[in-house]
């Protein structure tokens, strides 16, 4: 196994996940603010499930997104 290649591939995947998930969250928040369902000052609970079935990896990452 080439650790440098693994590192590059993991970073590429995480970059894709980060960009796509940020877009999805921002769009959903804007939609809910426009509908009046959010005021724009909430703290939203967020979670992400990272799963790689071939190696038995399943990790839940939790946090809060503060909207100001």
What do the predicted segments below correspond to?
Residues 12, 17-20:
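Long, contiguous binding/interaction regions
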Residues 19-22, 38:
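Alpha-helix boundary/capping and short turn/kink residues
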Residues 2-11, 27-30, 37-68:
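N-terminal intrinsically disordered, cationic/polar leader segments
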């Amino acid at each position: 196994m080439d650790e440098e290649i693994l590192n590059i591939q993991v970073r590429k995947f995480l970059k894709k996940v980060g960009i796509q998930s940020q877009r999805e969250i921002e769009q959903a928040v804007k939609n809910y603010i426009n509908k009046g369902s959010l005021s724009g000052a909430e703290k939203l609970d967020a979670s992400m499930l990272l799963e790689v079935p071939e190696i038995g990896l399943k990790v839940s990452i939790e946090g809060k997104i503060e909207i100001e």
